[in-house]
Amino acid sequence: MISKDDIRAILAEGTDLGPPEQFPDDADVVMDSFTLIVLQHGLEERHGVVIDPHFEDMEQFTSIDGIHAYLTALPAER
């Protein structure tokens, strides 16, 4: 299972959003196309998880909590 700390680490290492400790679970995350690619790449490299969110899924990608909720709802085969 991917933790919220895993998500924070991926975003912190691949973007200029700042250190992971500055990302509370409910903090706003600006998910532009670059940040989404960083997240997709990090999840695939570290956890073997491939995501391809649809437009309506992006509503969840506004916080660590939302991203984590999206990931935990994915079918197991991903």
Swiss-Prot record:
Pathway(s) where this gene product acts: Antibiotic biosynthesis
A single GO BP: antibiotic biosynthetic process
Keyword match Phosphoprotein: yes
InterPro entries: ACP-like_sf
Source superkingdom: Bacteria
Sorted UniProt keywords: Antibiotic biosynthesis, Phosphopantetheine, Phosphoprotein
Posttranslational modification: 4'-phosphopantetheine is transferred from CoA to a specific serine of the apo-form of this carrier protein.
Residue numbers of O-(pantetheine 4'-phosphoryl)serine PTMs: S33
Alphabetical list of Gene3D superfamilies matching this protein: ACP-like
Similarity section: Belongs to the acyl carrier protein (ACP) family.
Role played: Involved in the biosynthesis of actinomycin. Acts as a carrier in the transfer and thioesterification of 4-methyl-3-hydroxyanthranilic acid (4-MHA).
Listed name of the protein: 4-methyl-3-hydroxyanthranilic acid carrier protein
Organism: Streptomyces anulatus
